């Protein structure tokens, strides 16, 4: 199909903007004539439908329950979701193992040795998202040269034990991998070859110098990406969604930074504040239309409440802690 044909067909399609929360899902559909149609549904209503976002689109298109949604009637679908947020708050991510350089198995638990309450007599360590640690016999110098070579096969016994125990998500965090990723690349290939479905690699997820920040972010990504991937796949299949620029519906998701990304690129580390970030952007745009330059937003949902302010520029933080979990990824604040 030519680009001109795609543009012509786009004028005959519906566009949808969706905010999927833990309790309610809000859907706004823009009909081919430009009219806006709002709809609110319970996010979980297993007796009536499998997914609220898909059901909202189906209702606005007046599509029968017994037939598949016609993808030719849909242009774009843009969604903010708290699937990852609630997964983190409720600790409902996938079971995860950490593979880290030998001698550093407790590095992420120790963190930066910060004490939230300096006078507390009993220090309660945060709950870690990973449940198993495998120490990897390898080591790089700070300049990236090899001190101890990697032998991925030496980990096979431990990796098979993970598979046997039902752990399918792995976070790989090796010392100085930001400088030289060769060991992480080789180890990731070996782990994937053994059948692990989710392998998050620190030099790809968060290419930063500091081990703790890089490691924390990689663990979050491994923990949450599988539930996101399953949700995205379900929505894509129901809508017949395709990549941006291709014929067919385009599915995009709001990231924690306030930007949109293609469905196939939506990762756990970028999804923590997907829903709330969309609220901040919408608040700022709506206030601007009304003539306000400074505004405070109060976004109250069924699971969490987010407060934000806007004074002309979007504020973002790189180092963030959500539900007791540290990570380094750009997020609205």
Q: What is each residue range found by the language model?
A:
Residues 2-333:
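N-terminally biased helix-coil "hinge/interface" segments that flank
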